[in-house]
Amino acid sequence: MGGIKEFLKHEASGGILLMIATVAALLCQNTFLSDFYNEFLKTKFTVSFGEYGLSKPLILWVNDGLMAVFFFLIGLELKREVLEGELKNPSQIALPAIGAAGGLIVPAVIFYLFTKHDSFALGGWAIPTATDIAFALGILSLLGPRVPTSLKIFLMTLAIVDDLCAIVIIALFYTSELSAQMLAVASVCLAALFALNRLGVKSKAAYLIVGAVMWVAVLKSGVHATLAGVVAAFFIPISFKDEPGKSMLKSIEHDLHGWVAFGVLPIFAFVNAGISLRGVGLDEILSPVALGTALGLFVGKQVGVFSFSFLAIKFKLAKLPEGSNFIQLYGIAVLCGVGFTMSLFINSLAYNDTDAFAYADKLAILLGSVVSGAAGFILLKFSAKNQSARIKECKIQIETIVEKCEIKE
């Protein structure tokens, strides 16, 4: 439970920093700083190794490089949770997994209904299916102990399943032309990671070097480079036979949490959330992509997560999180519509970082996420007050009964 509390603490604090980074990006893009901001994002950085080198603008180093670190952390969390955490027990994963399925299907259907006549726009169908765990937990942190820990764990587990679905979606639907040569290099790296794991190698540097080479190979192969982070994480040992109490996976996960929560995600938000509001009019806001995205996040997510979860509980496939009620569960479902960084990331893959929709697509992500966050916060705060009032009323009734019994005696 200590690991879960630490995770929640990091993600919640990081969520607040994400909000600050988002506001900063919006201010930069919509003030006299806009030219400087855009030139800064286009600044090229080159890393060379002899005759080999990589030269990319800052925004791509962030989206392909830093986000690979984020997905590496997601991979570590997935492995740990499956082997000894919340995902180990089928009964514990049932409700979040079913809720995540609803949160994937319904938003995608809503987006499809709005964009089915435009094949290019339809490519962004996965944009409203994502949940930003850092932002969502950041909002939850504002409510403090009024939200049961069981609900926070439910949201965290649902978001992890959500991230797993995002990984599969990126691999299947957002991969460009493939390079057989680079895929072969990546395969050799995979074999090397497997060998390091089986031989019980304890050097983090060895895994880092092989992982870095694999990242470059995957980047050059046509498969999105972030997937290298996930795959590499699966080969990090969770324990060693001769030192069962030592875990390389947990050690790396612990070291990375702070860097990702307070560095990677805020930087990603700052370079991707710079939405220009100058060219966005009513026509753009009411365009199929914008409506499909905003309604997919705000309506689709809450309807999908709550309806699937509600049916799972009613048909006894899963149980309501301990100490919670259906209003609180609905509040969490609404909060799942905070797609923000993950939605922006999928948006950049779907539309190749173009401004084809005059920033209306990104603005829709921002609006859908903000409205979902605000509505979820209000619902959870309201349900917490009601629950406190009911508990107080029950205490008064119990005290009254006890007093009557004492008088009779």
From Swiss-Prot:
GO-annotated biological processes: regulation of pH
Superkingdom to which the source organism belongs: Bacteria
Membrane topology reported for the UniProt record: Multi-pass membrane protein
Q: Which cysteines are joined by disulfide bonds?
A: none
Query: Which Pfam family is an annotated match for this chain, by its short name?
Result: Na_H_antiport_1
Chief localisation class: membrane
Q: Which UniProt keywords apply?
A: Antiport, Cell inner membrane, Cell membrane, Ion transport, Membrane, Sodium, Sodium transport, Transmembrane, Transmembrane helix, Transport
An example GO CC term for this entry is: plasma membrane
Transmembrane residues, as ranges?
13-33, 58-78, 93-113, 120-140, 153-173, 176-196, 216-236, 256-276, 279-299, 326-346, 363-383
Q: Report the GO molecular function annotations.
A: sodium:proton antiporter activity
Instruction: Outline what the protein does.
Output: Na(+)/H(+) antiporter that extrudes sodium in exchange for external protons.
**Family statement drawn from the similarity comment of this UniProt entry:** Belongs to the NhaA Na(+)/H(+) (TC 2.A.33) antiporter family.
Q: What is this protein called?
A: Na(+)/H(+) antiporter NhaA
Mind giving the lineage of the organism this protein is from?
A: Bacteria, Pseudomonadati, Campylobacterota, Epsilonproteobacteria, Campylobacterales
